[in-house]
């Protein structure tokens, strides 16, 4: 059964979408009551214009990854092996997991979040908001065929919402 909210193909008979958690047994997609809601369901992550992601390998020294994040004014780096996403390392990881440890002796793979939740470039912005709220995430990688193409951030979503409300 195809989810009417995110387009994910679920197993026949599923009552809840495995991708976004939408109710599949409730008789369809809830209709937006405000034009604002319709835009969130109709606009996709491509509309946010996320730049290409910063990537590092799991073997990258933590201090090098942090320096790259600082230089690019980025909140995270995506961790890849052979161009495939294997993890994410964020500014929050640096503060909560790395602070107080000798960073030159550790690699990003020691502190990254492995196998992060991901989205596709054609997923609705509403799905990103849902996953961030439910999972407590501020950064979600965007992938195409397992290859990272961007990162949607809470900041991106808030800026977009502010523009939408103007």
Please give the residue ranges for each predicted region.
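Tandem CBS (Cystathionine beta-synthase) repeat/Bateman regulatory domains
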Residues: 1-166
